[in-house]
């Protein structure tokens, strides 16, 4: 598949309310969108690091700059027959998985379009419905959180993820568990703790959570392995899994019992598929996470969630949860309570509407 042109967009999506985690609060979501042109066809990708390098070392503008200045020249006016080829062409640029993903995912959606093959089929998945969960960041009070959890359970969500951070952890969790003693919960710590917090995790270990997601340093697998050895509750790695290499090391060390896969953080769809395969072979279950993408990126994550070995409800959400207006004509919606269905479209299931994209553009680069 020959790449004739690339349009790279740095965009801002306004949220209904800020999203608060251990690393801060985000009132808007910033992302990089790439429109790839091959012949008369176009295909899209979205990669969504946050505004600041708080979740990972990448920022949204830094990703935009890396794509347009360094990665795009490596792939423009060239022909690639596989994802491995395009990743190899970009491999001279170290790290920066969100930037690599912006290009690589566009290759996948274009290949899906040109070969008339749904993306989930290319990734070895099916079009069966996938189960999704509910997530809650830090709330203004525990009472507000409990009311929201009650509503999510009534809506049919079988598992609920709670953001945890110093000052919003054990007391909150005890209140949740005493109110909902049998429901499935897990916490996402976003690297907010260290091994010195072992006494806290020993207390959390008594609460019967499904997992503790990324409790320690964002690039670590060694300390996570030490922590996992001392807890019955499974650890799930998120930020640490920036590549298949890191997944291999996590498996070797016994650093986790679950893996969260995000295509931006992993460097694209091939790496996401590879990490899932490594996990499957090791008997480790996976699930798909999100970065609060618009429908363009969320639709791609939904296709990933159709892969085998997705053993836990995914972090996929309807557009109405976060955005007053979606960038595409059609929003992301549930296919049935707490479930979503992959698209049988070839290429992108969701593409930006020109006027809605124009309202969100901060910077745009066209290369041909």
Question: What kind of region is each of these model predictions?
Answer:
Residues 219-236, 241-339:
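Shared catalytic-loop signature of beta/alpha-barrel
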Residues 97, 128-132, 156-158, 181-183, ...:
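Short, well-ordered coil/turn segments that N-cap beta-strands
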Residues 158-166, 184-192, 209-218, 234-242, ...:
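Catalytic beta/alpha-barrel core
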Residues 177-179, 202-206, 225-230, 252:
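Histidine/acidic residue-rich metal-binding segments in metalloenzymes
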Residues 149, 170-177, 198-202, 221-225, ...:
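Generic structural signal for well-ordered alpha-helices
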Residues 1-185, 191-195, 203-206, 326-368:
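N-terminal capping/lid subdomain adjacent to the active-site entrance of alpha/beta enzymes
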Residues 47, 214, 316:
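Active-site donor-binding loop signature of nucleotide-sugar glycosyltransferases
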């Amino acid at each position: 598949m020959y790449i004739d042109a690339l349009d790279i967009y740095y965009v801002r999506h306004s949220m209904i309310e800020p999203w608060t985690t251990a690393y801060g609060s985000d009132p808007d979501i910033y992302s990089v969108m790439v429109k790839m042109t091959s012949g008369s066809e176009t295909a899209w990708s979205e990669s969504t690091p946050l505004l600041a390098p708080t979740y990972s070392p990448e920022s949204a503008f830094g990703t935009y700059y890396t794509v347009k200045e360094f990665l795009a020249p490596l792939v423009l006016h060239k022909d690639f027959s596989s994802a491995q080829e395009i990743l190899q062409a970009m491999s001279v640029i170290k790290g920066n998985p969100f930037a690599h993903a912006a290009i690589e995912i566009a290759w996948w959606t274009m290949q899906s379009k040109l070969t008339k093959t749904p993306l989930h089929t290319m990734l070895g998945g099916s079009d069966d419905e996938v189960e999704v969960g509910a997530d809650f960041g830090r709330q203004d009070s525990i009472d507000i959180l409990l009311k929201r959890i009650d509503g999510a359970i009534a809506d049919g969500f079988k598992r609920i993820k709670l953001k945890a951070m110093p000052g919003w952890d054990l007391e909150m969790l005890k209140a949740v568990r005493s109110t909902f003693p049998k429901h499935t919960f897990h916490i996402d710590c976003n690297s907010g703790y260290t091994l010195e917090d072992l006494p806290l995790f020993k207390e959390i270990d008594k609460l019967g959570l499904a997992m503790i997601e990324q409790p320690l340093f964002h690039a670590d697998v060694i300390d996570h392995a030490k922590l996992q050895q001392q807890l019955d509750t499974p650890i799930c790695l998120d930020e640490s899994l920036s590549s298949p290499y890191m997944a291999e090391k996590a498996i070797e060390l016994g650093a986790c019992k679950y893996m969260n896969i995000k295509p931006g953080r992993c460097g694209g769809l091939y790496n996401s598929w590879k990490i899932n395969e490594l996990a499957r072979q090791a008997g480790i279950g996976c699930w798909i996470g999100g970065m609060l993408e618009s429908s363009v990126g969320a639709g791609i994550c939904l296709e990933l969630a159709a892969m085998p070995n997705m053993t836990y409800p995914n972090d996929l959400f309807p557009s109405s949860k976060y955005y007053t207006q979606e960038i595409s004509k059609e929003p992301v919606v549930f296919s049935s309570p707490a479930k979503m269905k992959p698209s049988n479209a070839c290429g992108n299931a969701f593409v930006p509407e020109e006027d809605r994209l124009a309202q969100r553009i901060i910077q745009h680069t066209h290369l041909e």
